[in-house]
Amino acid sequence: MFKIDNLCYRYKKTSPYVLDGVSLELEKGEIGIMLGRNGAGKTTLFNSILGISRPVSGTISYDGIDMTKASRSQRARKIAYVPQNIQFGTLSVYDSIMLGRLSYFGVRAADSDRRVVENIIKEMKLEELAVRSVSELSGGERQKIAIARAMAQQ
């Protein structure tokens, strides 16, 4: 379960709250959507979920783990984000997907990390692209690689 409970956020101690008592519950398999006018706090809420911004009060939890107190590595194992425009540089498709495993290994990937990546490549039918540079791919193919990287976080 993903739960936001009474989340409050403001940019400065003297400024008004951008988020004031936001609450939400999503059961496994449910999909949520954020809609709102400009300046409504969608990006601020999203940044709080990702751990980029720290709320003044309230909690964000996933499977009972308080994400507002979780380490970056713990959050990466529970929350994945696929931006609309992602930069890959000159990485190969395989290496780019492997980056999704960073929270699981230190300096080097283990055999288990390689198996996860290879299974995702097979599952998403990316075998023919695996050795190519992401910079050579179309926009849609890049988006697919970004999703594969998020899946590698498990």
Label every PLM stretch briefly:
Residues 66-80, 107-113:
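ABC ATPase NBD coupling module
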Residues 112-129:
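Conserved ABC ATPase "signature" region
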Residues 35-37:
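The feature captures the beta-strand-to-loop junction immediately N-terminal to the Walker
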Residues 133-137, 141:
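Conserved ABC ATPase signature
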Residues 58-66:
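Conserved ABC transporter NBD signature motif
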Residues 1-4, 8-21, 28-33, 69-71:
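A short, flexible loop at the N-terminus of ABC-type nucleotide-binding domains that lies
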Residues 50:
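Helix-to-loop junction immediately C-terminal to a conserved catalytic motif
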